[in-house]
From Swiss-Prot:
One Pfam family in the UniProt entry: tRNA-synt_2
Chief place where the protein resides: cytoplasm
Record protein name field: Asparagine--tRNA ligase
PANTHER family assigned: ASPARAGINE--TRNA LIGASE, MITOCHONDRIAL-RELATED, ASPARTYL/LYSYL-TRNA SYNTHETASE
UniProt entry tagged with the keyword Lyase: no
GO molecular function terms noted in the UniProt entry: asparagine-tRNA ligase activity; ATP binding; catalytic activity, acting on a protein; nucleic acid binding; transferase activity
Family in the record: Belongs to the class-II aminoacyl-tRNA synthetase family.
Keywords assigned by UniProt, alphabetized: Aminoacyl-tRNA synthetase, ATP-binding, Cytoplasm, Ligase, Nucleotide-binding, Protein biosynthesis
Lineage: Bacteria, Bacillati, Bacillota, Clostridia, Eubacteriales
Record bears the keyword Nucleotide-binding: yes
GO term, biological process aspect, one: asparaginyl-tRNA aminoacylation
Quaternary data: Homodimer.
Domain of life of the native organism: Bacteria
EC annotation from Swiss-Prot or TrEMBL: 6.1.1.22
Length: 463
């Protein structure tokens, strides 16, 4: 008999009524009396469990009812409708086979566990209700990203994880080396001789695929990359991780407005797709994680995102009369408290803040005519703050060279990026959307460690 997924039983119940089926899964709970028992079985294909009813006519009944939680079973039986019960159907078992026993020391018992505790058993936490929902939503959201861009004829490109350049110019990168750390080759001035290293130069884990994606956009027009990025920031906060995933589109013949239009459409698309494809998981989050979740998400998808300049934002904040931990003045990098005040108290919806001071933005962002600001825009959303950052890219060779020098970067490391400006350069724009950031927003989870399967943070690289 072909095995049936529990998801199919829920999505196509009519097809299986009074039919003999076989399912497999792990025991979530067992309730028994002398002559019959109820098993909640989960096979990983669906958020909900299926109830299996067995009686003492089952050959191994006494053995089965003594099994610990998380033991795995195969069940042959008949699907029976139960209109007057909590669940709409159940499986009347005819035969049950033990696939694998579980230790009685299995840590995920029926009681509720804290998120902090579950992080210590990251190899087992996907079996809990919360993380079953989180990681299924992560999968669905990732598919939505690809679906959105493929429907718009963007080309999916893979950018290097090992790089010799620093996209952000921040220097917070993980270094890669195969050199013997007990016998590092040195130059005459006692600096490290990277010419003796594997790649013959200093290399790092990428902080962004943007620069490489730009090269592809100037061949294919519209491209996107979606992959892991790494930041060696010693930031032990709920919003930062050393390894995370970024969605980074780049669009040729596109100005700042085009980036903002695309980013707004993408965010709404991902949220709507998850709401449609994961209704059970989203209902769980709204009930147990954030009771205002549906209201917040519906506000996002039904709003036309606002657009204000950085200068206007500073003016609004200064005139608000609100007390902020970080004082507001022109030239500062807006903090989360400022971003949330704008989105929650002033506009009550997502907004783009544009035209930031060039001193606080990356070297590749196009300098505006005022010489003080760049054509950059951050998307701020209620409850979180920034989730998207992007800009029109600097296409003028002389200006880009000047900006690289201002940042104290080595122009030779960017020779190929500069050369793009010599061969049919055009205006182009792009942005980065932190995948974990939008997952936190969609699920209501408040810590980035809880939306990535095996989080990498300062002092922690388990599993």
């Amino acid at each position: 008999m072909k095995k049936t997924l529990v998801k199919s039983l829920y999505r196509e119940t009519e097809k299986f009524i009074d039919k003999d089926i076989e399912i497999s899964g792990w025991i979530r709970t067992i309730r028994d009396s002398k002559s019959f028992a109820f098993i909640e079985l989960n096979d990983g294909s669906f958020f909900k469990n299926v109830q299996v009813v067995l009686d003492d006519k089952i050959e191994n009944f006494k053995e089965i009812i003594k099994l610990p939680i998380s033991s795995s079973l195969s069940v042959e039986g008949t699907l029976i409708l139960t209109p007057n019960a909590k669940q709409s159907f159940e499986i009347k078992a005819k035969k049950i086979s033990l696939e694998g026993n579980s230790s009685s020391e299995y840590p995920l018992q029926k009681k509720r566990h804290t998120l902090e505790y579950l992080r210590t058993i990251a190899h087992l936490r996907p079996r809990s209700n919360t993380f079953s929902a989180v990681f299924r939503v992560r999968s669905i959201a990732a598919y939505a990203v690809h679906k959105f861009f493929q429907e718009k004829d963007f080309v999916y490109v893979n950018t290097p994880i090992i790089t010799g350049s620093d996209c952000e110019g921040a220097g917070e990168m993980f270094r890669i080396t195969t050199m013997d750390l007990n016998n590092v080759p040195k130059e005459e001035d006692n600096s490290v001789d990277f010419s003796k290293d594997f790649f013959g130069k200093e290399t790092n884990l990428t902080v962004s695929g943007q620069l490489s994606a730009e090269t592809m956009a100037l061949a294919f027009r519209n491209v996107y990359t979606f992959g892991p990025t790494f930041r060696a920031e010693d930031s032990n906060t709920s919003r930062h991780a050393a390894e995370f995933w970024m969605i980074e589109p780049e669009m040729a013949f596109a100005e700042l407005k085009d980036y903002m239009d695309t980013a707004e459409e993408l965010v709404k698309y991902i949220i709507n797709y998850v709401l449609e494809k994961a209704p059970e998981e989203m209902a769980f989050f709204n009930s147990f994680i954030d009771k205002s979740l549906f209201d917040r998400l519906n506000n996002v998808v039904n709003s036309e995102f606002g657009r204000i300049t950085y200068t206007e934002a500073v003016d609004i904040l200064q005139k608000s009369g609100a007390s902020f931990q970080y004082p507001v003045e022109w030239g500062i990098d807006l903090q989360t408290e400022h971003e949330r005040y704008l989105t929650e108290k002033v506009f009550e919806k997502p907004i783009f803040v544009t035209d930031y001071p060039k001193a606080i933005k990356a070297f590749y962002m196009r300098e505006n005519e005022d010489g003080k600001t760049v054509a950059a825009a951050d998307l701020l959303v209620p409850g979180v703050g920034e989730i998207v950052g992007g800009s029109q890219r600097e296409e003028r060779l002389s200006v880009l060279e000047k900006r690289i020098s201002e940042f104290g970067l080595n122009k030779e490391d960017y020779w190929w990026y500069l050369e793009l400006r010599k061969y049919g350069e055009t205006k182009h724009s792009g942005f980065g959307l932190g995948f974990e950031r939008i997952l936190m927003y969609i699920t209501g989870m408040s810590n980035i460690r809880d939306v990535i399967p095996f989080p990498r943070t300062p002092g922690s690289a388990e599993f």
